[in-house]
Each structure stands twice: as structure tokens, then as C-alpha cells.
């Protein structure tokens, strides 16, 4: 699936939170492939910039914050 497909699923509030979090990590994987880093490195960068741990997000709001950072990384690198 593409970044945008995972993004849509992450934003779908009818999906269980755990599935939405999984789609956020899939977005991180696709960003990592684009910029040449590992998925874990991207997740660490997101956490350092936003304080959101994508391995254990606490709320839908955190997922949105992380998504915004992932989109910025995707477009600026």
C-alpha cells in the first residue's frame, strides 16, 4: 500500500486504535524507504521531535501529531 493509503486508514476513526497505530508505523516504514533510514530511526526522529512514541501511542491525537511529522519528513527529504 502507498503512504496515502496508510494515511487514510490512520485517519479513519471507525478503525480500532491499534490498527490506526499500525498504519502510522507503516507510514514510518515508507518514509524510511524514501529517505534511506531504518523504520526505527524514523520512529526515533518522530519521537525526538514530537514526544510521540509510535511503538506505544497513547491517543488518536498523538497519531495525528506523528502523522504531521511523517508527512513533513516525506516532503522535505
Task: State each model region's role.
Residues 1-77:
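Alpha-helical propensity feature that highlights long, continuous alpha-helices across diverse contexts
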Amino acid at each position: 500500500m502507498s503512504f496515502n493509503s496508510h494515511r487514510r486508514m490512520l485517519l479513519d476513526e471507525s478503525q480500532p486504535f491499534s490498527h490506526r497505530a499500525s498504519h502510522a508505523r507503516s507510514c514510518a516504514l515508507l518514509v524510511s524507504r524514501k529517505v534511506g533510514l531504518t523504520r526505527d530511526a524514523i520512529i526515533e526522529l518522530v519521537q525526538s521531535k514530537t514526544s510521540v512514541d509510535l511503538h506505544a501511542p497513547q491517543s488518536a491525537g498523538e497519531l495525528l501529531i506523528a502523522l504531521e511529522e511523517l508527512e513533513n519528513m516525506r516532503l522535505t527529504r
